[in-house]
Amino acid sequence: MANIDAAFGLRPYERSGSNYNNQGVNAYPLNFDGSSAGSTSLIWTGSPVIPLASGLIDIVGNANGGTVPLLGVFMGCRYIATDGTPTWSAYWPGYAAIKSSTEATAFVADNPHALYVINADGALPDAALFANANLATAITGTNTSGYSLGELG
């Protein structure tokens, strides 16, 4: 069966070495104390994220040539919606979607030894296996599923 050409961002599938693979994530703030604006960018599950000088995180954008090292891969978030509903979401809808004076938390797969699966936007030569690669896009996704549409370029 042939592979399906459908972008889905980065999916962690194992860790290098011989350690337990629990697909663990760590929590990072998307805003502080509900008072700072926080990220207005949409971030989808499978999107690469970077740390900001403010202590928050944000989506990386087109990552090749960036000056900020990758923090990890966004795996979802929790926040209080504007109607007061506690919400777990596969994507971050931006600060405007959360209730004022509340905090939002992102969950990021940030193990530096994690290995990921990602779709390519075309055929790759065998020499590309286990090599570094550029992202064709990292800043798109679908709000319906909450998943990134990032893929290799």
What do the predicted segments below correspond to?
Residues 1-153:
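Surface-exposed, low-hydrophobicity beta-strand/loop segments enriched in small/polar/acidic residues
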